Amino acid sequence: FAEICEDVWVALPPSTLAALAGASVIVNLSASNITVGKDEYRHALTANQSARTLSAYVYTAAGPGESTTDLAWDGQALIYENGTLLAESRRFVWEPQLIVADIDLERLSQERSRTTSFGANRRVHREQLKAFRRICLELELPGGALELERTVARFPYVPSDRHLRAKRCGEVYAIQTQGLAKRLRS
């Protein structure tokens, strides 16, 4: 599914309904000029939309060649999968760039199946979703061994960052403690 620029900035982006209709990869072709701080805002916006829609969200802004004396463009490109940044371009580069990432479509499908609110939203918007045309693609994989662009962590549920790991372990401890306390009070 494709959005154009500020489609993602509105209260109900078209990609939200597209995701409910089955789109798993959303591309935003943007001509959004750059201002101070907009880089971080785009990251937050794209991360949140990919997380809310349980999708891959590819955002690409016009590059420096579009710049004038009044406005500037940075050529920022981002690929997020369910709220996680997979790839990012360099900004303010005059040469053409290509960013590539492995998107785990099966993971996204699994997350959508497991997230009950996603299915509930689908039912709520059933009539609106009928307007979407579904185009299924069969991709033929190249033969031989394929190298992944993304790194798969040895322990994917254990953060490698020491501070984040300590925080996560603290949360696990608090959750288990609360559950045990509730059981003992019953």
Map each language-model feature to its residues.
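CN hydrolase (nitrilase-like) catalytic-core segments centered on the catalytic cysteine
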Residues: 9-99
